[in-house]
């Protein structure tokens, strides 16, 4: 976390002893980073949000997507999940989103996306976000996104990953 106050709060709330840490995504040395199967990332939305100036990649915050792409290229996780504001879809007449999808596809990933609203998943607020999912194993196509409206009972089993084990709890999920 680049923001010193947010970093401090995170360390107060969570036990971070022994965690791998880098306070700025632009300075990550991927060879020092542990391997992983799933990369979950968000890049700053201000550059794409209708509430902001919508400067896109001309805004330094907008270029952080390319740092995420660098991590994906260097570490080659089986999956990635990215999140941002729906304004990303229409920014620069869709060219920005096309660049993002093309960049991820050129890295060898199958890429899907969908706009989801938190209110449809038991969260007491309406907050739309675009989710971008990528995976190396083509057998996952159509099994991650789109998915039906959440009912709080279970997740699908996906194939791939380094352990090849189930990635859902057999007893299902409870509503929040």
Segments and roles (model prediction):
Residues 1-27:
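SAM cofactor-binding core of SAM-dependent methyltransferases
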Residues 43:
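Glycine-rich, N-terminal phosphate-binding loop of Rossmann-like dinucleotide-binding domains
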Residues 28-38, 46-176:
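Class I S-adenosyl-L-methionine
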């Amino acid at each position: 976390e680049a923001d010193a106050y947010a970093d401090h709060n995170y360390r107060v709330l969570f036990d971070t002893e022994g965690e791998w840490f880098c306070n700025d995504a632009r300075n990550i040395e991927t060879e020092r980073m542990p391997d992983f199967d799933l990369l979950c990332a968000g890049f700053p939305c201000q550059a794409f949000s209708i509430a902001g100036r919508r400067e896109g990649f001309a805004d330094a915050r907008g270029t952080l997507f390319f740092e995420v792409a660098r991590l994906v290229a260097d570490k080659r996780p089986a999956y990635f999940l990215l999140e941002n504001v729906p304004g990303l879809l229409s920014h620069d007449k869709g060219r920005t989103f096309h660049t993002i999808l093309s960049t991820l596809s050129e890295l060898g990933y199958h890429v899907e996306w969908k706009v989801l609203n938190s209110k449809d998943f038991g969260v007491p607020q309406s907050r739309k976000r675009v989710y971008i999912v990528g995976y190396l194993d083509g057998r996952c196509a159509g099994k991650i996104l789109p998915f039906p409206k959440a009912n709080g009972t279970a997740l699908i089993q996906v194939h791939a990953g380094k352990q090849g084990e189930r990635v859902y709890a057999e007893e299902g999920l409870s509503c929040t």
